[in-house]
């Protein structure tokens, strides 16, 4: 026996093709013999079921494509995470090496502290680090080294601030990635289950479908384009993102393709610093003669760059003192300046890797949310057809008229322009439609009206995931 829904829908389509309004005799037969009315059309295929099956097929196709995209995103995300861990490991190794070298350096430079600390406090140092970018790096290195010596000499100034354990952060990331994988995996299972149910419905009704539709529905989803993709768009401006196409470009792999660059030598910085000092000395001479270099340029929060020019001899003495401190540093702690540079670059690498991991994570989450949204919309639109899979051959009609109640009298008011029709949808549920006569027996739109109401009822009562 054909699936019950086919009995009713085929009959509806046959009547709609006739394009003729029912007569008074037809109205009597509808009221007196509803079962005969429901059996009248067992010829054509149910277009609503066919449309829903097409939707379920496309749902499967779209989910498979989303699975591929999700896999690429997750591979990229995990690679980013690995690279972030490597960057952090590198930074820790450099920091440990630096701390060891600093311990060796502290004792040897203790005697130089009193002589070199004035270099760090000089107005000329503030001038050089403000107006000459090359000096900033060198000053930072010297200052960091001698501050550590100061902390060594005066332990109560030691900075006890420590970072949070890294292990806790990575554990949180593990949980986050696992949650994403679990949600997507469950969504994949749910979509697969719905498609299998719809395939069962297709097999029950296969003989009623044309060969072209059978060929499409049975085809490999990777080798044939679907009939259409329904345009399910989210509300305006919801989850707007520049990467919404979700075609995974190759540049994702470049996000985490990190490697250490060749560290700049400290000697190059020193050379630039000395050159800047010579240039400044020339500018001071020009300023003494009223040259153009006497013009001052304000620097936000640092005063005027022209201030030290008023006492060039003091700055030249400052240069000599700092040069001596630099010589001490190079002689007693040759590895420390370079390790400071490496530590700075390793920290920058960690920061970049954290940012890029966060970007890919955000894209992965958006992709999951968009996929969930699309699957839910397609399930709401087409998933009702899977309810028919529970009907076995030989069961009662899914769509059938049980009774027709003519006009109802309420006091002095007569509702003879309406009729009540009880319709059975599946053995477990009945519902009643109140249909105006002009929209039923006397109208050629009666079949379309009934069909729309029945499908709407199915969708409204179709259970969620």
UniProtKB/Swiss-Prot annotation:
SMART domains reported in the protein's UniProt record: CLa, CLb
Keyword vocabulary terms for this entry: Coiled coil, Disulfide bond, Glycoprotein, Secreted, Signal
InterPro entries reported in the protein's UniProt record: Clusterin-like, Clusterin_C, Clusterin_N
Glycosylation (residues): 196, 257, 311, 351, 412, 430
Coiled-coil regions, chain positions: 62-107
Cellular component terms (Gene Ontology): extracellular space; nucleus
Keyword Transmembrane belongs to the record: no
Protein localization: Secreted
SS bonds (residue pairs): 105-333, 116-325, 119-322, 124-315, 131-305
Signal peptide (from-to): 1-20
Main subcellular location: secreted
Pfam families attached to this UniProt entry: Clusterin (PF01093)
Gene Ontology molecular function, alphabetical: misfolded protein binding
Region (Disordered) residue spans: 280-300
Family from the record: Belongs to the clusterin family.
UniProt-recorded name of the protein: Clusterin-like protein 1
Organism: Bos taurus
Gene (name only): CLUL1
